[in-house]
């Protein structure tokens, strides 16, 4: 059986370093990196070129190696379900026994940005925001046999985030009566009173923390928090929260956002996780 390892993480989260360490113990593993292919095709890893061409070549080489029973590390950001879906489907459809592992490098955003500034090739700040807005925590039904989270929680990061949430104040949106802190606390207490599973309760406490990064205002001065759930999910991972907490937070807005499409996501997430998502979603609604 060969191994397919997909790295998942923001720029400067440590994907290259993780791959190098892994290779020391597993020297026959092939590493395919989107940055390396950009450099190969265009002479510069920062040259975006044609993403379709880059990833088609990356997928082709990956599948070829797996057919030869070689282990592969697939090194790209892979932050969204859409980013991961194509290659995972192709690997699953190989007439080979392949173990598929997802490695999430949930390095604190602050650390990623510090590392980024120290690199020769600096990724613009807006790219971090774009990737966080697209962040979708992996789930097993995507095709993974195993998902691991690698992080280094830093107490000052949690203190900074909690302070901002506590002092955030009025959410400036007619759908929210309570402050951000009060809303999250009410959601948490509601789930506690229902004797919900512990991961669901904790997800309720943190589910909207991403709003501290995503507040925008419309022409009438009403605040909106688009993709806040994606930010919240990553924040939980970087603070040392569990994979399931991040999954619940990431997908608790699905019943709002995919009217008529719930059945698709119900199948994708699996019945057990979907029921927990609905539990969190309902508590969130009632805590407004």
Where do the protein language model's features map onto the residues?
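Pre-Walker A (Motif I) flank of P-loop NTPase domains
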Residues: 1-5, 68-70
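Conserved GTP-binding G-domain of TRAFAC-class P-loop NTPases and closely related GTPase folds
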Residues: 4, 8, 13, 21, ...
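ATP-dependent NMP and nucleoside kinases share a basic, alpha-helical "lid"
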Residues: 40, 66, 79-121, 134-139
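Short catalytic-loop micro-motif centered on adjacent basic/acidic residues
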Residues: 71-76, 102
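Acidic/His-rich, divalent-metal-binding segments that scaffold phosphate/diphosphate chemistry
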Residues: 151-217
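Divalent metal-dependent catalytic cores for phosphoryl transfer on phosphate-bearing substrates
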Residues: 190-287
């Amino acid at each position: 059986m060969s191994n397919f390892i997909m790295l998942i993480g923001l720029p400067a989260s440590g994907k290259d370093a993780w791959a190098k360490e892994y290779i020391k113990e597993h020297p026959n593993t092939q590493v395919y990196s989107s940055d390396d292919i950009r450099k190969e095709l265009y002479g510069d890893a920062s040259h975006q070129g044609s993403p379709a061409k880059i990833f088609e070549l990356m997928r082709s080489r990956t599948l070829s190696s797996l057919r030869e029973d070689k282990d592969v590390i697939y090194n790209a950001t892979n932050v969204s379900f859409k980013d991961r879906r194509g290659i995972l489907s192709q690997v699953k459809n190989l007439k080979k026994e392949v173990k598929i592992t997802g490695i999430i490098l949930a390095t604190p955003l602050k650390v990623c940005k510090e590392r980024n500034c120290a690199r020769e090739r600096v990724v613009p700040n807006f790219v971090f925001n774009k990737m966080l807005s697209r962040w979708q925590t992996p789930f097993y039904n995507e095709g993974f046999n195993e998902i691991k989270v690698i992080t280094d929680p830093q107490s000052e990061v949690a203190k900074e985030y909690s302070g901002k949430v506590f002092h955030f104040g009025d959410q400036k949106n007619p759908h929210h009566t309570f402050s951000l802190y009060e809303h999250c606390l009410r959601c948490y207490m509601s789930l506690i009173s229902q004797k919900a599973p512990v991961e669901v309760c904790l997800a309720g406490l943190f589910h909207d923390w991403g709003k501290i990064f995503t507040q925008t205002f419309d022409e009438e001065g009403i605040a909106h928090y688009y993709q806040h759930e994606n930010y919240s999910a990553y924040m939980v991972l970087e603070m040392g929260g569990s994979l399931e907490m991040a999954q619940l937070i990431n997908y608790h807005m699905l019943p709002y956002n995919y009217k008529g499409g719930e059945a698709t996501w119900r199948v994708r997430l699996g019945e057990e996780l979907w029921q927990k998502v609905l539990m969190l979603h309902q508590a969130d609604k009632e805590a407004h």
